[in-house]
Amino acid sequence: MRLTHVTACICLLVAVAVLFSGCTGTTDDQTTTPTPTATAAEEVQLKVFHAGSLTGPFEKVKAEFEAEHSGVTVLLEPAGSVDCVKKITENGKPADVLASADYALIPQLMVPDDADWYLTFAKNRMVLTYSNESKYADEITAENWYEVLARDGVRWGFSDPNSDPCGYRSPMVIQLAEGYYEDDQIFETLVGEHSEITVTEEGGVYTIHAADPKPDSTTLTIRPKSVELVQMIQAGGLDYAWEYRSVAVQNDLEFIELPEEIDLSSIDFAENYATVQTEAKKGDGTTLYVGSPIVYGVTVPKIAQHPDLGIEFVEMLIGATGQEILERDGQPPIVPAGGYGEVPDALQSLVEMKS
């Protein structure tokens, strides 16, 4: 009798176990899918093509932007501004932001096919940079710089007029110097004798022909990007180089500030700047860059893969964060930024429309 009772209890327990298993377990026809605890954010790469002279401030804007946008990596691609534009207009490379050291390149080369709006957001000026180890560093001034550059053994340079705005602006400054210092041999002595760059005059306008510069590379050196010359100054490969003031400040270079009449910094002398222009290569032909105050421009190209994020990057650039960074890096911001074309609604409150 006891055995029968025990057997019955065991059978009951087994039945309960089987029933419980059937309620909570799986059968051969069932599969179990784990419930995800979190979905990883999709990694986004925001591509920014920008002038080499913007490298310093843009690295800081990049850090601020990434800190506020989880999952976004900003890829900075510096180059001469003309080359930056050509990557988009001629090579079809996508960029989410395009920032040029010459704002005029955007309406001239990108609007309307590759962009339908742009902003002017910062200013600059041309300076002559050097180091304490440069020849005659203890003698050079804003009054005698062109005489120092002409001395035997002095090595100096500027960037390529065909790829970099600093490059086509440098000979403009030298040509403007002839009128300011009342010496009509400055350009020929410094540039003409050491390269294939020539100047012609018609109706009071001087055209600098620089499509095929061919510098002698002993006295005069020309490099694709102006920032490359910084390294040469620091390494002692050059004594002097033409740069933007912001680049000199960011790289702790010595520099000579020139009169506003010739340094392309002031709208008060815009008419005087316009008396010089540089002819440079464009595709199979040439184009003319007319002297004007140095103003930076930015846009989100039509080819952008992440246009909304591009607009947010521009918003940070022209807002309080970007203004502080630019000011600290020796690149005075334009406040408010100037707006042209179909400026996005998200930027309207930070922009003064110009046309």
UniProtKB/Swiss-Prot annotation:
Family recorded in the similarity comment: Belongs to the bacterial solute-binding protein 1 family. WtpA subfamily.
Entry-linked CDD domains: PBP2_ModA_WtpA
Signal peptide: 1-22
UniProt source species: Methanoculleus marisnigri (strain ATCC 35101 / DSM 1498 / JR1)
Keyword Transport: no
InterPro entries referenced in this protein's UniProt entry, alphabetically: ABC_trnspt_W-bd_WtpA (IPR022498), ModA/WtpA (IPR050682)
Single GO molecular function: molybdate ion binding
Transmembrane feature ranges: none
Protein name as it appears in the record: Uncharacterized solute-binding protein Memar_1880
Disulfide bond entries: none
Source domain of life: Archaea
Keywords: Signal
Keyword Signal assigned: yes
GO biological process, one term: molybdate ion transport
Lineage per the UniProt record: Archaea, Methanobacteriati, Methanobacteriota, Stenosarchaea group, Methanomicrobia
One Pfam match: SBP_bac_11
